[in-house]
């Protein structure tokens, strides 16, 4: 029998913040990765994490999921400190979905087989399982590619499938790691619309990270700029664009928001 315990899904309280990183610090050897970092995701918010490669964005995701633990500070989900909770408890009990930058699916299975495989793990009711698969195929317009193996899909199609798979368990919090990386302009626009629609229609709280500000800022309510393991600025996209000179002080002249 499986050693994984059964956990009762937590009902998210009617409060503003669903996730907080409170004074979180982390070192890898002598390298300071996160330095007394504070971050908050509000209910129904789309929060963007901006920063150069190595700034600590993916590390924040790994901390939220429980893949690594902080040296100091607290990770709080739905008003509960979860530092010692393993990944399966966090993702199941607190309904966290994750869409990685690369992969997130079985390459040798078709789109439909991928959806079916994850649904069989996460949904016990057979009729709802079929309903969920069909609704995601419809929502993401996957029907033309449902019988194609994931390995043969385009970059944009793979990203759609990966997001759809993350949504099978009806998450309350969704993490999107570099969702626009290496995609063409039209595909990025489609994915931006998908992200905004997910928040509006499903009331999901979303965090997405990217190093391209102009792509991320078009679909978030608020963005936090991560530099040297700290949040050096957090504001609305409009205010960050106006405060461009302050951002260049951290990222140099190559940092372009517009």
In which residue ranges do the predicted regions lie?
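Conserved ABC transporter NBD signature motif
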Residues: 73-82, 92-93
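The feature captures the beta-strand-to-loop junction immediately N-terminal to the Walker
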Residues: 50-52
């Amino acid at each position: 029998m499986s050693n994984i315990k059964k956990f009762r899904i937590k009902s998210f309280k009617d409060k503003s913040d669903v996730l907080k990183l409170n004074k979180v610090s982390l070192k890898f050897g002598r390298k300071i990765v996160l330095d007394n970092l504070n971050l908050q995701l509000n209910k129904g918010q789309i929060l963007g994490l901006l920063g150069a490669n190595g700034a600590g964005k993916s590390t924040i995701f790994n901390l939220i999921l429980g893949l690594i633990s902080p040296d100091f500070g607290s990770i709080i989900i739905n008003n509960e400190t979860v530092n010692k909770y393993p990944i399966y408890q966090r993702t199941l009990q607190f309904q966290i979905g994750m869409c990685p930058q690369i992969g997130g699916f079985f390459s040798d299975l078709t789109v439909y087989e991928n959806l079916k495989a994850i649904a069989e793990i996460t949904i016990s009711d057979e009729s709802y399982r079929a309903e969920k698969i069909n609704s995601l195929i419809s929502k993401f317009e996957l029907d033309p590619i449902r019988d194609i193996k994931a390995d043969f899909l385009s970059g944009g199609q793979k990203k759609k499938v990966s997001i759809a798979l993350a949504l099978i368990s009806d998450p309350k919090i969704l993490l999107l790691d570099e969702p626009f990386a290496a995609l063409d302009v039209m595909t990025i626009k489609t994915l931006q619309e998908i992200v905004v629609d997910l928040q509006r229609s499903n009331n999901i709280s979303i965090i997405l990270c990217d190093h391209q500000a102009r792509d991320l800022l078009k679909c978030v309510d608020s963005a936090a700029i991560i530099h040297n393991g700290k949040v050096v600025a957090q504001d609305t996209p409009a205010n960050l664009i106006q405060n461009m000179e302050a951002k260049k002080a951290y990222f140099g002249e190559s940092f372009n928001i517009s």
